[in-house]
Design a protein with these regions (language model features):
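C-terminal coupling/interaction segments
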Residues: 2-6, 278-327
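Primarily ABC-family ATPase nucleotide-binding module
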Residues: 5-14
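ABC transporter nucleotide-binding domains
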Residues: 13-18, 23-221, 226
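Solvent-exposed beta-strand sheet faces enriched in polar/charged residues
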Residues: 19, 75, 269, 301-303
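A generic structural signal for secondary-structure junctions
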Residues: 91, 108, 117, 156, ...
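ABC transporter nucleotide-binding domain
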Residues: 186-277
Length: 327
């Protein structure tokens, strides 16, 4: 799959599909004819600086602001015509989470569950499960007014879990969190994905988003400049995706490495050292290739493409190093 731009139509199996989506405020264009699709179970990132159009795009998906032109579909529903249906299936975590500060965490979730029409028994089961999954069981009976921002964000995810939302839309979810809280929150997002939830998140914190997103759309001035996986964007923008170094003894290793699918270049650095440029992380394939020619593998390492370098090259024209090391 190659990187895409805003003119690429969404895939037919998309659970969220936007086509030519546009939002104008008078003469100002906040979102300019964007098209994209998000598949079931995918973590998709809307990335870009503040004011790039990410939040406005989210609000149109939720039916919370009018669409000027174009269309968007969420699980087959038109948010402009059926906002309540979208709300029933989608969990939304805004940049500033709104809870009743005078109520406890459990009471806030109980209020949400009651509005959903759940029985008392079902409410209790879902709330206990949600609080456990976001690690808030011990503070379930504390007032939300005493919560840190990180705890509020986790409570927001708990509400999405209580709803059993098919899609979770998270607007700048890690903004303002300390490093440890950020790590914990990103892991919770990964857990949602493993449970089959489709996740759309917006952020300007590139390194954090790179850890969890399957694909990203890079926003600038209301338009999608590029879209795809980080590896795909790296090949298109930086000319390389993953760089894998192999240290191994044996004959015919370079030739065997060059036959691995996704490898675009193999360099011989010394008698037993090789560098591969590839569209994906090919370390398992490289190890198998060395074994296949009866070689002796000594070391494997990979340099991953950096989303920050891709972003800088795309939007700022900076010629930065295109990799982030990971042994």
């Amino acid at each position: 799959m190659t990187a895409q731009n805003e003119n690429t139509p969404p895939p037919v199996d998309a659970v969220i599909a936007a086509q030519g989506l546009t939002k104008r405020y008078g003469k100002a264009v906040a979102v300019d004819q964007i098209s994209f699709g998000i598949r079931k179970g995918e973590v998709f990132g809307l990335l870009g600086p503040n004011g790039a159009g990410k939040t406005t795009t989210i609000l149109m998906m939720l039916g919370l602001t009018e669409i000027s032109s174009g269309s968007v579909s969420v699980l087959g529903f038109n948010p402009a015509r059926s906002p309540l249906e979208v709300k029933r299936h989608v969990g939304y975590l805004p940049d500033s989470v709104g809870f009743y500060d005078h109520l406890t965490a459990m009471e806030n979730l109980a209020y949400t569950a009651k509005l959903m029409g759940l029985s008392l028994a079902e409410r209790a089961l879902r709330i206990a499960d949600a609080l456990s999954r976001v690690r808030l069981t011990e503070v379930a009976h504390k007032r939300v007014a005493t919560f840190s921002r990180g705890m509020r964000q986790r409570l927001g995810l708990a509400e999405i879990i209580v709803k059993r939302a098919e899609i979770a839309i998270l607007d700048e979810p890690t903004s303002g969190l300390d490093p440890q809280a950020t790590i914990e929150f990103l892991e919770l997002i990964s857990e949602l994905k493993r449970g089959g939830t489709t996740v759309l998140l917006s952020s300007h914190l590139l390194d954090q988003v790179q850890r969890i997103c399957d694909r990203v759309a890079l926003f600038k001035a209301g338009r999608i400049e590029m879209m795809g996986s980080v590896a795909e964007l790296a090949v298109q923008v930086l000319g390389a995706g993953f760089v894998v170094e192999v240290e191994a003894e044996g004959a015919g290793i370079a030739l065997k490495l060059s036959t691995i699918p996704g490898v675009t270049k193999v360099e011989t650095l010394s008698a037993d050292r090789y560098r591969m440029t590839a569209e994906r992380d090919v370390r398992p394939d490289a190890a198998s290739a060395v074994v296949a020619v009866n070689g002796a593998l000594k070391r494997l390492s990979v340099d991953e493409p950096s989303l920050e370098a891709i972003y800088a090259r795309t939007f700022q024209g900076k010629r930065e190093g295109g990799v982030r090391h990971a042994a």
